[in-house]
From Swiss-Prot:
Protein known as: Transcriptional repressor NrdR
Domain of life: Bacteria
Recorded name of the encoding gene: nrdR
PANTHER family: TRANSCRIPTIONAL REPRESSOR NRDR
Organism: Rhizorhabdus wittichii (strain DSM 6014 / CCUG 31198 / JCM 15750 / NBRC 105917 / EY 4224 / RW1) (Sphingomonas wittichii)
Cofactor(s) required for function per UniProt: Zn(2+)
Ranges for region Disordered: 1-22
Length: 154
């Protein structure tokens, strides 16, 4: 594995263990060139998935991009990083087991919205503001009002 610090080609695995949910192997590595330590994760990939964007472009599904989007929505919120990891894993599994090799970006966004709704209402509204492309404050007010009403009803 190439070192992210010095780009040396070889590193030595110092420790391996499964993640809490068992969906990945966490490996601590040490670069044989500069001695820096870093962590890698090994996950099963059932098949390569393609995300179809709204403008028709196609991108290879990128789990780190999914996790980053969820993390940005949850920034400065009392959400445990392990819960973000579990949500990303659940969405990835749902996509991989769907039976399709291509999935619309809107479907992925909907899955994230559903997951964030159960995780944290503020993160849910933050993600929705980007996903649904809110243009003005009234869009926020209307959406937040609907979320608040749903919370009282449910």
């Amino acid at each position: 594995m190439r070192c992210p610090f010095c780009a040396h080609d070889d590193s030595q695995v110092k420790d391996s263990r499964p993640t809490d949910d068992g969906a990945a192997i966490r490996r601590r590595r040490q670069c044989e060139g500069c001695g820096a330590r870093f962590t890698t994760f090994e996950r099963i990939q059932l098949r390569e998935m393609t995300v179809v964007k709204s403008d028709g472009r196609r991108e290879v599904f990128d789990r780190s991009k999914l996790e980053r989007s969820i993390s940005v929505a949850c920034r400065k919120r009392p959400v445990d990083p392990a819960r973000i990891e579990r949500l990303a894993t659940a969405i990835q599994r749902q996509i991989e087991t769907s039976g399709d090799s291509e999935i619309p970006a809107a479907s992925v966004g909907g899955m994230v919205m559903d997951g964030l709704k159960a995780l944290d209402s503020v993160a849910y509204i933050r993600f929705a503001s980007v996903y649904k492309d809110f243009r003005e404050a009234k869009d926020f007010e209307d959406f937040a009002g609907a979320v608040s009403e749903a919370g009282r009803d449910g």
